[in-house]
Amino acid sequence: MRKNILFITSCLLATTTFAENINTLPKDTTKVIDIEDVVVIASPKETGKLRELPTAVSLLSQKDMQANQITTLKNVSSLVPNFFMPDYGSRLTSAIYIRGIGSRINTPAVGLYVDNIPYIDKSAFDFNFYDIERIDILRGPQGTLYGRNTMGGLIKVHTRSPFSYQGTDVKLSYGTKSNYRSVSLTHYHRWSDCFAFSAGGYYEGSDGFFRNSLNGKKVDNMEAGGGRIHAIWLPSENLKLDFTIGYDYSDEGGYPYYYTGAIDGYDKENEKYKNYTGKISYDQDCTYRRGLFNTGLNIEYQAQKFILSAVTGFQNLNDRMFMDQDFLPVSIYTIEQKQRLNTISEEITFKSKNNKRWQWVTGVSGFYQWLHTTGPVNFMEDGVTDMIEGNINNTFKKIHLDNPRTPEMSLDVLNNRIRVSGSFDTPVFSTALYHQSTFNDLFVKGLSVTAGLRLEYEKMSMNYFSDSNIDFDFFLKMAMPPLNIPFRNLNATPLLEGKEKNDYVQLLPKLAFKYDFSPANNMYVSITKGYRSGGYNVQMFSELIQSDMQQKMIEAILNKAPESMAGMIEGMIKQHMPNYGKELNVQETTVYKPEY
């Protein structure tokens, strides 16, 4: 039916063009009229066309993406104004900025929906666009309809519908510089007027661009692959079921970073690693591996006066990052971070139908996310000597320099390597209720007013565990009387274990005025509140555990020393370590509050 309509329209346009130009066009002129298929993508929330909304919108069609080689969100930066997603590190580093608003770590400030299903964690934002129909980018806060983490804007990605297109797509790409290669195949089949499906997959790989100066190997190689099944069933004229399931796997080298030299305040002339400045020269491979599973069901029921939509989504992410954190050819310290994430989401919306003067949408949404993170830090030989042993000995040296009459103190760590464990469970629950109404042709034709309000509740918690074990010797050297006192085989066991809880309530209003000069031109003023949700910065635990490590080592010294010496040692340390003896405040260090 759609093809027949397009054929009739093409004939009418061709006839009209011929009638208007038959007397003016030269006889040897050939005029070609190219009409693209019109694809209508419905949204459960918006009550009007995206281009007519009182917000800044960029729409990228599949033709736009193919012409500009858009294969991931990171490529969109070259095409969409005020949008930036830096391409560095790995797929884990998926910070997005719209109008300068974004977040490099923790929760994002820009939201992402794929086929109306939210991607809650930005670790899943970087994926392949092999079967994408359209991308919508809304700039500015979208908190009233979309809630948390849309303070900067919103990205909506739509896969191609097997009802709007049938056939088999095969795409092949090759690039010489990095030996980039990719292939994708997707088949779209319309079984009947009531059922259609698509199934496809892709593979891509690259040898990378950056070489390690130590071994000559490229460090940013990559291989990825995945597939997706999309099925749509129309049991009746007013009921639609849209199901998707997909999996993506990537294994890549990453983090082609290099040492930039000593910062201001350090002795640059006697810098230890001067020869490695500006060179990729780490001695441990940096890698990132991710498995990403997504599935969702969109149910749409069209009643006489409203449209009911129910969207259910589930996401599973398992990844592993290994990083040589010193980025030097020395054994200082490494980190191995693993994430295991499961998210289930549900959203039910009612919106108006066939009502031009008053358009409205009401909805309720919620999700629950389980996230388990492990991030042990391994201090290698140089790290034990320079960072753990060296930092404390530098403090002891400063004590003696400030007061030469005090005894000289030093310690010797006996471990060749020290492992600092880190295990974190950070579940998040969120639910919201919202309504938005638009009144068209208010007072005068072309003037519309949009008002909305969202009430959102969010609850989160963190169970944390981090520990270590250090064996060391301590030495005390007194001048008068000359005396060397060793305290051997001391042991310190720093430990951080506990639970934090936080919850927030947010009201997200919206008010917008729009005047339509014509169907293609309008002017609007919009006031909207957006917010970035709070959470826990587990990366700060490395600083906390190092502080606790120093305290536990000093406590071990004081417990071993005679009572007469213990008081003297503790007094000297307190003058130069003001945080010694103070209880570590985990909440103050790791909890970050919502931003508006």
Locations of regions flagged by a protein language model:
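N-terminal periplasmic "start-of-domain" segments of outer-membrane beta-barrel proteins
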Residues: 22, 32-65, 94-95, 110
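Short acidic/polar hinge/loop motifs at secondary-structure boundaries
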Residues: 115-141
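Structural signature of Gram-negative outer-membrane beta-barrels, strongest in the C-terminal barrel
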Residues: 232-236, 350-353, 365-367, 424-596
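Transmembrane beta-strands of outer-membrane beta-barrel pores
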Residues: 172-178, 203-207, 247-251, 303, ...
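Outer-membrane beta-barrel translocator/receptor signature
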Residues: 94, 108, 121, 130-133, ...
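Short, polar/charged loop or turn motifs at beta-strand boundaries
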Residues: 53-72, 97-100, 120, 174
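Extracytoplasmic beta-strand/coil segments of soluble accessory domains associated
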Residues: 74-117
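Periplasmic-side early beta-strands and strand-to-turn transitions of outer-membrane beta-barrels
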Residues: 164-165, 173, 190-284, 317-331, ...
